[in-house]
Amino acid sequence: MYDIGEVILETKNVSKHFPASGGRTLIANNDINLKLYKGKTLGLVGESGCGKSTLMRMLISLDEPTSGQILFKGEDISKLKGEEKRLNRQYIQMVFQDPTSSFNPKMKIRDIICEPLMNFGRIKPSEKD
């Protein structure tokens, strides 16, 4: 059997439900199971409104799942709070769908890339050049 490597990020039965008008529930994600392997790339595609961004927001801890687990290096990160949650963000980040609204056009690309690295003490300001 081919060994595809270490699982770095995994979702187990992750669901996200939102309250809707009339006492209804909008199901954005329902029992999502996926594995991301260290050093590999995974593309997530689907129709507009199918829940891709909602899933990504949960993976980077901007939203909490209604149910299920999100495991990073085997540890459940879906319920992290406060400083633990902030520190975990140094390992999982994303560029949103419209990078032109996510990035400051007055900043150099180098500065955009280095900013989160400096925020988490991964590099010193003097090292960004």
Each predicted region: which residue ranges?
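ABC transporter nucleotide-binding domains
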Residues: M1-D129
